[in-house]
Amino acid sequence: MNKGQRARDKGQIVWLFLALATIFIYFYGLNIPLLGPDEPRYAQVAREMLERCDWITPTLGGARWLEKPSLLYWLEMVSYKIFGVTEFAARFGSALFGLGTIFSLWILGKFLAAENTEQNGEKTQTADRRPQSDFANWLALIAASSIGLLAFARGASFDIILTFPITASLVSFFIFDQSQEKSFTARRLPLVAFYFFIGVSLLAKGLIGIIFPLAIVGFYYLLAFKFPGKTFVFSLLWGTLLSLLVAALWYLPMYQAHGWTFVDEFFVQHHFLRYTSNKYLHPQPFWFFWLVLPLMTIPWLPFFLAAICNLIKNIFHHRKTQNAEQNEKLSTFDSRLTTFALAWMLVPLAFFSLSGSKLPGYILPALPAALILTADYAARFVRQSKRREIALQTLAFLTFAFVVVMLQFFTHTVARHETVKNLIVAADSRGFADAKILTLHNVSANAEFYGTGRLQRLPDGKRRYLYGVAQVKEFIEQNGNQPVLVLVPLEYLDELTTSDLVAAEVLSDNGNLAIAAVNLR
């Protein structure tokens, strides 16, 4: 065995180790308490659907919850059946879809390397071509270790659930568009996958699941100054039908069950009004996502910025440096890949920058495109020396190690102040496991999951907001003078404990909220 072969074997072992580390890190620490307003709500919706054996109608507190489609809930329901109703199960589908996003990008890299090898007539791998065959690994590694993907793949929310099928659909389209094979299978299967995953995207987060892929493809053709071929144009007929058939698994029975109520709540209120207004109180400046998206590429931000600088230089100066010309050898499809990634990145950026409602996760479907540009630059960077390759692999591993340290030693501390789980556990251990739970001067979304079945609600299913101790007293009287648990912000705790209307015993607090056992005096 020569030195070159030994070096390649050693390199493959390193890549295998990093792949296993990626899988480990994406499932590690998913059992921390649910955080924020969304995770506990979505996890509870799935639990209620599972308890009713209802795969169609989402509910929260028994009331219809028509904000989002079903895919996340289905993933959580299946996970609950396998792992039980736990935080890990609630997040398992998100982690799986995070890995699916990474794998889709790896497939893209493999396709580019294979096409490049074919075009150059190179059927065997040689030492100087190694960086090209490794491009798929670099693309996957950079995606896996980006802070945006690491963070959102750990949350029981819809953003990563949308990002994977959009990534899979666009990768499928690019393979169709660039494939040199003319066989029926090679030309049609990627198109079938493109439209199938559009259907899955519709199940993931609604209309955006079809708007983004088609708009990105259209913008790509515009940037590339070319017309789509007949095969793609004709595919719009049968392909759109395929996408709608996949989406109909949920949309059709939902409409049959709820009619205009579903259309108004889901499409009008949570699609059009959410986009065109600030009804849901998430305002941000126009440039918000132009800052958020680059930050999601950390720790690869310098490479992303360098890639963008090179791209701008090439666009506006119509020339390439000698170094860039040499780097062009990475792939014969490099310019078309860059054009496609640019279209992929700009469409969501432009779309959501005009939205009246802005949250960081909205821009996640654009992150894979940013990572393609980043990985393209980084793969060229490591061609200069073996030391650079080792340095970047080490950076990715250190990022994984940093995540483990944060989850092990810091996240639980932060979660303690953000969750009511420990408060309710403490109260239950004191003999109040059957007591109703009220919220005074707050509506804790976290309690939706951890206080399930015990929260006070209005007739329409919405949580009741209590403004004073008198309302607590009134509820106790209506509840047969049984003691209740009250979640109250610490700044209002004295109002409860010093009241002449009720007797309150503070059982625990998390630094933000306290839980008290309350009865009549």
Feature-to-residue mapping (PLM):
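Membrane-integral, polyisoprenol-dependent glycosyltransferases
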Residues: M1-N2, D9-Q322, Q326-Q384, F410, ...
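N-terminal signal-anchor/signal peptide hydrophobic helix marking the start
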Residues: W15-F17, R91, R388-L398
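Small-residue-rich segments of transmembrane alpha-helices in multi-pass membrane proteins
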Residues: S243-V246, L398-V404
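Structural motif
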Residues: F351, L485-L487, A517
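Membrane-interfacial segments at transmembrane helix termini in multi-pass membrane proteins
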Residues: A378-L392, T399-F400, E418
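Short periplasmic/luminal acceptor-recognition loop of GT-C membrane glycosyltransferases, typified by
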Residues: F400-L496, L501-L513
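Core SAM-dependent methyltransferase catalytic element
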Residues: A514-R521
